[in-house]
Regions:
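Short, conserved beta-strand element in jelly-roll/cupin
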Residues: 68-86
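Canonical tetratricopeptide repeat
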Residues: 173, 207-208
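Short acidic-glycine-tyrosine-enriched beta hairpin
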Residues: 90-105
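Ligand-binding loop in jelly-roll beta-barrel domains
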Residues: 105-130
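A short, N-terminal "cap"/entry segment at the start of jelly-roll beta-barrel domains
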Residues: 1-61
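Alpha-helical segment of the N-proximal tetratricopeptide repeat
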Residues: 131-163
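Start-of-helix register in tetratricopeptide repeats
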Residues: 135, 169, 203-204
């Protein structure tokens, strides 16, 4: 079905959306897909995206929302089809299609697809704070990174830093892209700046394969 738009609403099916870049350096190529629902509908008041994965693959990668501070996003996971096994702070939850799972920012979570094509919609926002969408160049940078074009990825990420000069994750990603592009000095500069902003970035630096 085609997308419909008028003054009061926008309609689209998830099947109409093209898979979007994975927003993590070094993410495994395991068939998981991300759909940028927020950007497709030009939503600016909250974050929303969807993930789809084959059986046995993590639909939701293991993470917390407080790695870089205590004001991370509160998230609601909606199992649209298929089924998933959630693991949240050591507890297991079986979530068939139609399930809603709300997770606090500090909780460590992941969800594994039990069926091929399991799809989860994720809605998130930081309690008590207005939502601030990431610059488009951040997604563009990862699109280039995922094709091996590290120079373009770095160029796009530099634009992100012009808009968010005090963003630790933005500096960290720029450091990863610079390292892949063979620009060691610039990589160290960005990583050093990220560590100045928050020492919590050490966990990412220690585990990221781009920085080996």
């Amino acid at each position: 079905m085609t997308t419909t738009a008028n003054q009061g609403y926008v309609f689209a099916t998830l099947e109409e959306l093209e898979p979007a870049p994975t927003l993590a350096p070094g993410a495994p190529n395991d068939g998981r897909q991300r759909f940028d629902v927020r950007r497709r509908f030009e939503i600016t008041s909250f974050g929303v995206q969807a993930f789809r994965a084959p059986e046995g693959v993590e639909v939701v990668r293991e993470h917390t929302e407080t790695l870089l501070g205590e004001d991370g996003q509160e998230e609601l996971y909606i199992v649209m089809n298929g089924a998933a096994t959630f693991e949240i702070d050591g507890e297991t939850i079986e979530a068939p299609a139609g399930s809603l799972v709300q997770v606090r920012p500090a909780a460590r979570r992941k969800a594994t697809a039990k069926d091929d094509g399991t799809t989860i919609l994720v809605v998130g926002g930081t309690p008590g704070k207005a939502y601030e969408p990431a610059p488009q160049e951040a997604a563009d940078a990862f699109a280039a990174y995922n094709t091996g074009d590290f120079e373009t990825a770095l160029a796009k990420q530099r634009v992100v830093l012009e808009k968010r000069p005090n963003d630790a994750v933005a500096h960290f990603n720029a450091g990863c892209f610079a390292a892949r592009a063979g620009l060691g000095d610039e990589a160290f500069d960005h990583l050093g700046r990220a560590l100045q902003i928050t020492e919590r970035i050490k966990e990412l630096v220690a585990t990221d394969e781009d920085l080996d």
